[in-house]
A protein has these predicted regions:
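Short acidic, glycine/proline-rich loop/turn micro-motifs
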Residues: 183-186
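Hydrophobic, aromatic-enriched interface-forming segments
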Residues: 151-158
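An accessory alpha-helical subdomain
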Residues: 174-180
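N-terminal catalytic or cofactor-binding beta/alpha core of small enzyme domains
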Residues: 2-145, 158-167, 188-221
Length: 221
């Protein structure tokens, strides 16, 4: 009788960001901290990143070397958005409206000089958005991760993976402000922490459930 084939447990590195822009809270960090250690059979490794241009992707690179995950899913705050955004594209552009937490404020500079104009994420973005909506949380597929540290991390991590760990996939979710963050921001939308956490768990379940990924690849030159 043949020996049973060993089933490898999927490992997903999930990252959030520290508060920035004068805020005292960042829902992405709080969601990551509240995630269980296992989701849909996948091991969840949690990491909070500094909201700093080059330091954030360096922390991810260190975690990649240490944990060797199958997937990296980064979470970030996107004030003004009304739904959870599953990002499809990372662009090779740093153009910061405000300084990061180290005072960096690049204008019209590349994330990686000489890198591709953009990368399409290789996670199942539509399946992730559908799973989030099925969990009762508004969600959309987004074509812009902005030009701040969130996009910088999405692009930099993918660029690093293409060169060092091409079998590892990565993607990004943007979540709205917390209700407490908009008390002094009339008209700004928000989402309770529990809903954002539910959305992230649903997206991770979709990833761990073996949904087919989009073909890997870059666009532009």
């Amino acid at each position: 009788m043949a020996e049973a084939e060993e089933v490898k447990t999927m490992k997903i590195l999930v990252t959030g960001f520290e508060p920035f822009g004068g805020e005292t809270r960042n829902p992405s960090a709080e969601v990551v901290e509240h995630l269980p250690d296992t989701i849909a059979g996948a091991e969840i490794v949690k990491l909070i990143l500094p909201t700093v241009r080059y330091e954030a992707p360096q922390r991810v690179a260190e975690a990649l070397e240490r944990y060797r995950p199958d997937v990296v899913l980064s979470i970030g705050q996107a004030g003004g958005r009304t739904a959870v955004s599953v990002e499809r594209v990372a662009v090779n552009l740093d153009d910061y409206r405000i300084p990061d937490n180290a005072g960096n404020q690049p204008q019209e500079e590349p994330v990686v000089p000489g890198g591709p104009d953009a990368y399409l994420t290789n996670l199942p973005v539509k399946a992730m958005a559908e799973a989030i909506r099925a969990a009762g949380v508004p969600a959309e597929v987004s074509l812009s991760a902005g030009t701040f540290v969130c996009n910088h991390v999405l692009y930099s991590v993918r660029h690093y993976l293409e060169r060092h760990f091409p079998g590892i996939r990565n993607g990004f979710l943007h979540i709205p402000y917390l209700p407490e963050q908009v008390l002094d921001k009339p008209g700004q939308p928000s989402m309770p922490l529990e809903l954002s956490r539910r959305a992230v768990e649903a997206a991770l379940t979709a990833i761990a459930g073996g949904n087919a990924a989009m073909p890997a690849g870059a666009t532009g030159g």
